[in-house]
A protein has these predicted regions:
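Bacterial N-terminal signal peptides
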Residues: 4-13
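C-terminal active-site rim and adjoining tail of enzyme catalytic domains
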Residues: 20-24, 117-123, 193-194, 198-294
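Metal-dependent phosphodiesterase/phospholipase catalytic core, i.e.
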Residues: 20-25, 34, 80-191, 213-234, ...
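Active-site beta-loop-alpha junctions enriched in small/polar residues
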Residues: 41, 69-73, 81-82, 149-151, ...
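Short, solvent-exposed loop/turn elements at domain surfaces
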Residues: 44-48, 86-88
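Catalytic domains of carbohydrate-active enzymes, especially glycoside hydrolases
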Residues: 53-70, 209-218
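GT-A fold catalytic core of metal-dependent nucleotide-sugar glycosyltransferases
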Residues: 61-85, 89
Length: 294
């Protein structure tokens, strides 16, 4: 019954919402506290998931994302792909088909994960996450998103315990988020999702039944086309209102977009945070948007 009521309520909001919401990020979040997630480290600015990429993201004033996997001998590292085909284009086919999980740390640590993007980046390596935690401990104001690919959460919680308050665990798996919060209650979380408005409505209804427990931030993937946005403006306005009523930061990922006007339009709709492959463009668009209020 509660789920049906929520679906009806969100549906009504989507149908009737016309004007932009009265709530605007500029009135509630100082620009210095605006959270931008740099996808896979620094987006397109650097080879992904490297210490160098994370450094660029922090220099821009954003929060880098690390994708976590575990080597054959149990070392948690930052690496996104299921295999090495994209990152090691010059390697032999047998090597390209392998996964992080098939190699030991000694085998992983010598891989050049930067050369595929150009000789300027040659020599960059897969980072061990314990090294990243040491960097975070030295810079208490820095934060890091950690997206779980293949990791034992108990091991992750144990190894990162000194910097739990600087971590934001990101996952599309709600049960995993709840498990992590039991292990690391000081850590923030981000629940990300994409799909049609119907699919998103159903997922939000399910979270509503759980009172959005253990979720700090929620991210919706937004795709732009000639016909408008998917999901649409009215849906995003209604979703933002729902999330704010539960104290959850509303983040959008403008999928593969580097259009400053799209970032600014999403802020008009009540979006209060971004994930992006173009963190430099996003930060400039945000600065310009905040300056419009002066």
């Amino acid at each position: 019954m509660k789920e049906s009521a929520f679906l009806l309520g969100l549906s009504l909001c989507v149908v009737t919402a016309g004007d932009p919401p009265k709530w605007n990020v500029r009135d509630h979040i100082p620009i210095e506290q605006f959270t931008v997630q740099s996808h896979r480290g620094a987006g397109v600015l650097s080879p992904e998931n490297s210490i160098e990429a994370f450094g660029i993201a922090w220099q821009l004033g954003t929060v880098p994302e690390a994708d976590l996997r575990t080597t054959k001998d149990g070392v948690i590292v930052a690496f996104h792909d299921n295999d090495f085909k994209r990152i090691l284009p010059a390697a032999d086919p047998a090597m390209q088909s392998k996964r992080i999980e098939d190699l030991t740390w000694d085998e992983v640590r010598v891989l050049d994960i930067g050369a595929w993007k150009g000789q300027t980046f040659a020599g960059q390596r897969v980072p061990m996450m314990t090294d990243m935690y040491r960097i975070l401990a030295q810079h208490p104001k820095r934060r890091l998103y950690i997206d779980i690919k293949n990791v034992d959460l108990v091991q992750l919680a144990r190894e990162s315990r000194k910097v739990h308050n600087q971590l934001i665990l990101a996952s599309t798996d709600y049960d995993l988020i709840c498990e992590w919060k039991r292990l690391a209650p000081r850590s923030a979380t981000l629940h990300w999702m994409g799909g049609t408005e119907e699919q998103l409505t159903a997922r939000l209804a399910s979270l509503r039944k759980a009172n959005f427990a253990d979720i700090t931030q929620l991210q919706i993937h937004v795709r732009a086309a000639q016909g408008g946005l998917t999901p649409g403006d009215k849906f995003l306005i209604a979703a933002g209102e729902q999330l704010r009523s539960h104290g959850i930061l509303f983040q959008a990922l403008p999928w593969m977009s580097k259009d400053p006007k799209l970032f600014q339009h999403l802020m008009d709709l009540g979006v209060a945070s971004f994930a992006t492959d173009y963190p430099d463009i996003a930060m400039q668009a945000i600065r310009e948007y905040y300056n419009l209020k002066k």
